[in-house]
Amino acid sequence: MPIEANASLRSLAYDALKRAITEMDIYGTLEDIRLDERRLSQELGVSRTPIREALTLLEQEGFVRPVPRRGIFVVRKSKREIIDMIVVWAALESMAARLAAARAPAEDLAALRALFEEFRDEPPSEHMNEYSEANIKFHQTILRLSGCELIVDMTENLFIHIRAIRTVSLRQDHRAERSMREHLGIIAALQARDADLAERLTREHTLGLAAHVEKHGVFAE
């Protein structure tokens, strides 16, 4: 979608490119993912100058990397780096769950449970795209319901990789069904205002993803 010219074109291009990278299946293939300046310029409806400036910002943040005579590529992390990121995420999200147990309005927790209502009658593995989106929304909502902006900010630059890894992992080793059971357990703890249990279940759930990546993850190193 072309971006409007009533704001900084560089900022708009940056936001559009970062959002696009976030939504990419960057760990679903071992092939390098190249970003084409000309194509991006055409798709966003801006000149290549703000595209280059936006890519420079993304490079500084570690999301893309230039390769001489080849172009700009999306950065993918090694297995060790991914596991470390998941461990950090587990610490932050489990604290968010503890805070949410005390702070989150009851209606927001009910809405969190409602995310999974459509998957009660049929296994989530039969609706992977929809369940994957619900899964991502669940984890982002836990962070938001903590009421702690610092936790939200600290997870922002991890999100691109964590989202992509969760999307791939849900399709492996029957993780979708297990994921939903664990989500419902976390929600029950939140609704019971049991901060200790909510924190523990959230930590165990996310560290389970780290263990899965350790066992099953295949990455281009």
Language model features: what each stretch is:
Residues 52, 103-106, 130-132, 151-152, ...:
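Juxtamembrane/interface motifs at transmembrane-helix termini
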Residues 137-138, 145, 151-167, 211:
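C-terminal regulatory/oligomerization modules of transcriptional regulators
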Residues 160, 164-221:
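C-terminal all-alpha effector/ligand-binding and dimerization domain
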